[in-house]
Amino acid sequence: GCVERHMSAPSGPYEALWQEGEGLLARCFPSGGVVSGCPLHLSLRLADVPAHRLRCIGAEHSQLQFGRSAVETDPRSGLCRYGACLPGRCRSLTLTMLYPRGQLDAARHLFSLFSPLASLIAVMPVGNMDRWIAYDADERAADQLTQALYTQPVTDVPAAFRLYCLVVPSGEAAAALMGRQLSVRLRRLVLSLGSLYVGAIPLHAVSSGGFGRYLPSVASRLLVQMGGMPWMPRRFASQDTDLIAGFSCSRPSQCFESFSAVTFYNHPARGCCFDLCKAEGKFSLFFASRFRRAYEQFLTDHRDSPPRRLVVYCHRDLPTAALLSLVRWMVPYSEAVPVVLAQVRRTSRAMLRHYAPDAPGCMPPAGTVLGCTDDTFLLFCRDFRPASGSLRAFYPYPLEIRLNHLCADGSLQPLSSAEADGVLVQAFQLVRANPACVDGNPLPLVLSHTDRLLRHRCQEWQLEMADRIAMD
């Protein structure tokens, strides 16, 4: 390996980054080495990595299905070229714009930006400007919009076929509205009415046309809410063997009360199902029933053939108390089905870019796996994308994954090489199948899903606390 030196060893806020770089270097190159520089540039020549530490996932596992039978490897280009794999039950969406008073032209322009939905997810956007709602961008906004939504005239359009889009001012005016949690309040209200919600969209994103860049991501998330699937792995390697779960828990920075969330996944066409998000004290009361339903669904799908293992994805920095709780809930099931714990961590903050100096962007191709220790791996899930026009280069930072068997006594044991290979392929496909971002979400689908469940629940909890304090 080689190290690019820019200056002496850093100190202060860069010390932790420097130590992390040294740790990664030591794990990948046991013979030794040093790292320095600020910003940190670390070159790991893959040709110098011992063969048993370097693996490559086959190209067939990178293939995604779009439309009826089209196959692509890039989510954005595949969705824009072929459309969704499994359209939702909606064939048209009635858009209702919630816009600042005096910004009707901006709302009309935003409506026009939604026109590609017809080709992306087989949904035709329609709307009636007479039913759009203008609001004053001040402290009255929440009350005005809440009253307007509750008193909207009855129409023939089912609630599930209506989409509400919140447009907010740019700059300080938007900050004031968000400080009053306007978007959170409206999302909760709209979802309680059985409709769909997108927001908050700033005016500058509408006027500059920047929203068009994000429309494929918005479209893919909308389609999932409508019961469809924007794309899925052409052949999911673990479909007939593994029951998969994602687990997340809240942090004190999100809310004082602790919440936990879990979801289950097996068939790509079904996506995440049997979601559960509860306060930690109540979570254990519902977990067993959700797991039982997911297990029975697997048996139904596979003619009473049970899963060979349960793979649980969680964050690597999961608090110790939450990890112990997860282990306590899972141990009773380890006798019925082997449990594999996959702890993942995004490495984007480590700023380690120069893994392969001879490759485009100094990044190895998607599907590259670098073994750090017996149970820890660096998994590259996306290819480097160079800068194009106004778009910056996309560096696909690797996902750090720690894989262990959960034993009946609560201890963790490393997987065999063959078992680890199977779970790494599964994690690779779950990252690529994630509809949260067409340009590549760095987390497996199930973990991104539980993070979103948890984030929305914590936002609602904060809103409930704020309203309670205001009433007192």
What do the PLM-derived regions correspond to, one by one?
Residues 1-204, 462, 466-472:
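Extended, highly charged clamp/arch subdomains and adjacent linkers
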